[in-house]
Design a protein with these regions (language model features):
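N-terminal leader/linker segments that initiate helical-solenoid repeat arrays
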Residues: 16-71, 75, 79-82
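Register position in tetratricopeptide repeats
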Residues: 29, 59, 93-94, 127-128, ...
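Canonical positions in the second alpha-helix
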Residues: 39, 43, 72-73, 106-107, ...
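Structural marker of alpha-solenoid helical repeat scaffolds
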Residues: 42-43, 76, 110, 143-145, ...
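Start-of-helix register in tetratricopeptide repeats
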Residues: 48, 82, 116, 149-150, ...
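Canonical tetratricopeptide repeat
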Residues: 52, 59, 86, 120-123, ...
Length: 283
């Protein structure tokens, strides 16, 4: 009889605990992080609950508190990859970038094949202008991974080192593999324009425009290439489209004004150059 009572109590306790855990998970799923933290505080500390606690704290913008939570997990479970990743994310939000790098490195030591961590790690190296290290990491990545993001990271590393020729090569590679990648097209436009290769800039941006004629970033480079290549009628068409889509930026107004002026449409030129002058009254 005592055994039956004991088993009944154990089953009841287990069921109640499972229900409480479910309530925590439901609160987090509903983004009700305050309720989740209140419920977690009533439970015995476990690694899974600490992970939930950290997520709730981050959801409420309590990044310093969340970092402490993930550090507690790491202290008790040094092989918990997720805790290192989350700690790194917290450090980034707190501008503790060197500490974030270390956490990413520890996560990669535990799981070298984790693509998300490697992308974040290289991205952080780039933001810290550690371009040589970023190039090394991204080049290793592209040996096994030819995804657009891997190639972009390598290209950005070359750009940061002012190695524009190999950077351009990377972007051409991306455009060849992923023709719908607008950023590669825009970058090719910008890099070729910077080198005064206007025909190449036009070719790269027009290649993308055969897929999508609406992308603002690509259209800006395309229009500028036509303008600098002195094909003013086409430049005017491209810039007029940008204006019709609400683009009133300095460069759009300025180069549209220049294009109108070159075509001797002085009234239109005046209007757009005047609009551009508002951004730079001393010019």
């Amino acid at each position: 009889m005592k055994r039956i009572i004991l088993l009944t109590l154990l089953c009841t306790t287990t069921i109640l605990m499972a229900q409480r855990i479910n309530h925590i998970q439901e609160a987090i799923a509903d983004y009700d992080y305050e309720t989740a933290l209140i419920l977690i505080a009533k439970e015995k500390t476990t690694i899974p609950l600490l992970l939930q606690k950290g997520k709730a704290q981050r959801g409420l913008g309590l990044n310093a508190e969340a970092l402490s939570t993930y550090q507690e997990i790491i202290a008790n479970d040094t092989a918990n990859t997720r805790a290192y990743i989350e700690a790194a994310e917290c450090c980034r939000s707190l501008a503790k970038n060197q500490q974030a790098l270390k956490y990413y490195e520890q996560a990669l030591d535990l799981n070298p094949e984790n693509k998300y961590v490697r992308i974040q790690y290289i991205g952080l190296l780039l933001s810290l202008q550690k371009f040589q290290e970023a190039l090394g990491e991204s080049s290793l990545m592209t040996e096994k991974d030819s995804s657009a993001i891997a190639l972009h990271l390598q290209a950005q590393s070359f750009e940061g080192m002012e190695e524009f020729l190999p950077a351009t090569g990377c972007y051409y590679n991306i455009q060849e593999k992923y023709p719908d990648d607008y950023l590669a097209a825009a970058k090719l436009g910008a890099l070729n324009i910077a080198g005064s290769y206007f025909d190449e800039a036009i070719e790269a941006t027009e290649k993308y425009r055969r897929i999508d004629t609406t992308n603002v970033a690509v259209n800006r480079q395309n229009a500028l290439a036509y303008c600098l290549n002195k094909d003013y009628p086409t430049a005017i068409q491209r810039y007029e489209y940008l204006v019709s889509q609400g683009d009133s930026s300095f460069h759009t107004c300025y180069y549209l004004g220049i294009s109108y002026y070159a075509e001797e449409k002085y009234y239109e030129a005046h209007d757009f150059l005047e609009a551009a002058r508002k951004y730079d009254p001393e010019n």
